[in-house]
Design a protein with these regions (language model features):
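Small-residue-rich hydrophobic transmembrane alpha-helices
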Residues: 51-111, 148-167, 273-337, 373-395
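Short runs within selected transmembrane alpha-helices of multi-pass transporters and secretion channels
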Residues: 72, 140-159, 167-175, 196-209, ...
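Helix-terminus/linker motif at the lipid-water interface of multi-pass membrane proteins
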Residues: 29, 33-52, 121-128, 184-191, ...
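Transmembrane helical elements of multi-pass membrane transporters/channels
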Residues: 19-38, 140, 174, 203-207, ...
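Hydrophobic transmembrane alpha-helices of multi-pass small-molecule transporters
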Residues: 63, 178-182, 207-212, 283-286, ...
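N-terminal transmembrane alpha-helices
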Residues: 8-45, 62-74, 78, 103-110, ...
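Short alpha-helical transmembrane segments in multi-pass integral membrane proteins
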Residues: 1-21, 79-144, 188-243, 299-368, ...
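Interfacial/gating helices of multi-pass transporter permease domains
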Residues: 42-62, 128-133, 193-194, 234-241, ...
Length: 446
């Protein structure tokens, strides 16, 4: 069991968080690798229009993924608290009911997303010359929603128990499979965006299966029929933790969709430039996500064990580590960002130069303010680990209004490049709310 779980209630907070976060960072690197390979292969083989087609669905994809990750992350909060408190019977029942709720959510999400796909693309003012390719990509990827949900719940259980190594291995497997299949389906068979979508879904299936096998090896979360029996209040408690995170992700996504609507009105070249930078956004954000997962598990376990002082030390250590990491990534982007962006773009020389200029402008703005995003993740996750998912949900509402407001108003004042500042403004508004709320909430446990 010791190889599959990690007790985060003992030992150096900074060391524990770093040991937990680093495998997740490596896993995110591999996840970004196969996302970037999708973009590079499609952009280089199928051209700028195909690249724009992928970009046009970016926020729609993020929204559907956000629903799945939101509910499972909420479930993991209670799982980590029971593990920290050593309540083994409650732990098994919580895991079992998390499986049931995840399955129901996945089925509903699959049906809704398939029905709404075309409507969303039309609503977003997707350019006529790319909407067909965008719809093909969405239809195929949406078929994999149950697979993504399975991966998310199994990975969430593992992370709640302090295991970040297994999700890393799963991401490495998925990245390797995705790269190979991209080359076969897109470059070899010339299937375009459909091939990229098939490669992604297949890779996700292998990562989900690997995490499932790993969870099966952990005795303390072995579930039987009795664990699935109705427990008064349990589903409500799980949904009470998961629903606000789900709503938070959805409202952030809706804000992103509103921004995408504005961007789509600027033409496919602007969409392509925006897309190229958004593919690197995953690289900018990957360590922040990792620290977020680490903080949720760390705070949840220590709250279950009643170790409030350790929570404070862990959050401070995480903030410092997040700042250093964001500074390093920003420097890398300023040094090599243009080279990385150029990998995504091919075609007519005049068009590619315009796309690259748009992409570089956006990337330089985000890299300059990256530390704000990292603080946002740390403090949002700390609140979630404390069992407070309402304030993080409200931070999503703040992100929505700030992002949409800036996207609609600033371009009218300084031109279309003003839309690039919508993301930074949204980060800042949410981060301020979360930091203030954390310090107010932690005093209640002192």
């Amino acid at each position: 069991m010791s190889a599959q779980v990690r007790d985060m209630t003992k030992g150096s907070p900074a060391k524990l968080i770093l040991l937990f976060a680093v495998p997740l960072m490596l896993g995110n690197i591999f996840q970004q690798l196969y996302t970037m390979v999708d973009t590079i292969v499609v952009g280089q083989v199928a051209g700028v229009q195909a690249l724009a087609a992928l970009g046009a669905v970016e926020w729609i994809m993020w929204m559907t993924l956000g629903v799945s990750t939101g509910v499972t992350q909420g479930f993991s909060i209670l799982i980590s608290q029971h593990y920290g408190a050593k309540k083994w019977n409650d732990l098994k029942k919580t895991v079992a009911h998390s499986y049931l709720l995840t399955a129901v959510t996945a089925i509903l999400l699959l049906l809704i997303s398939q029905l709404a796909a075309r409507w969303l693309l039309v609503l977003l003012n997707t350019p006529d010359n790319i909407i067909g390719m965008s719809l093909i990509y969405l239809r195929i990827v949406f078929c994999g929603i149950p697979i993504v949900a399975a991966y998310n719940i199994f990975a969430s259980v593992l992370r709640a128990l302090g295991n970040s190594r297994t999700p890393l291995i799963a991401m490495i497997i998925a990245a390797f499979i995705n790269v190979v299949l991209d080359l076969v389906f897109v470059a070899g068979f010339n299937w375009g965006v459909a091939g990229a979508a098939l490669a992604t879904v297949t890779a996700q299936a292998f990562s989900a299966f690997y995490c499932f096998l790993s969870v099966r090896k952990i005795e303390i979360v072995h579930t039987d029929r009795d664990d699935f029996a109705k427990v008064p209040g349990l589903n409500r408690k799980l949904f009470g933790l998961g629903a606000p995170i789900l709503f938070q992700n959805v409202i952030i996504s809706v804000g992103g969709l509103a921004v995408q609507f504005v961007i789509n009105g600027y033409g496919f070249l602007f969409v392509a430039g925006f897309t190229a930078t958004n593919k690197l956004y995953g690289v900018l954000e990957m360590a922040a996500i990792s620290y977020g997962y680490a903080v949720v598990s760390y705070v949840g376990q220590n709250l279950g064990a009643g170790e409030i002082t350790r929570i404070k030390k862990g959050v401070h250590a995480s903030s410092f580590l997040a700042f250093l990491t964001s500074a390093f990534i920003s420097i890398v982007m300023f040094l090599f960002g243009k080279t990385l962006l150029s990998m995504f773009i091919s075609g007519d020389t005049e068009q590619t130069s315009q796309v690259l200029a748009i992409a570089w402008h956006y990337l330089s703005i985000m890299a300059s303010c990256l530390c704000i995003l990292y603080f946002l993740y740390v403090y949002r996750s700390a609140l979630q680990g404390l069992g407070n998912t309402m304030i993080p949900m409200l931070s999503g509402v703040v992100e929505f209004f700030v992002r949409v407001g800036v996207a609609l108003l600033l371009p009218k004042l300084i031109g279309q490049n003003g839309i690039f500042y919508a993301e930074i403004a949204a980060w800042t508004g949410a981060a301020v709310l979360l930091m203030i709320s954390y310090y107010i909430n932690i005093r209640k446990f002192a």
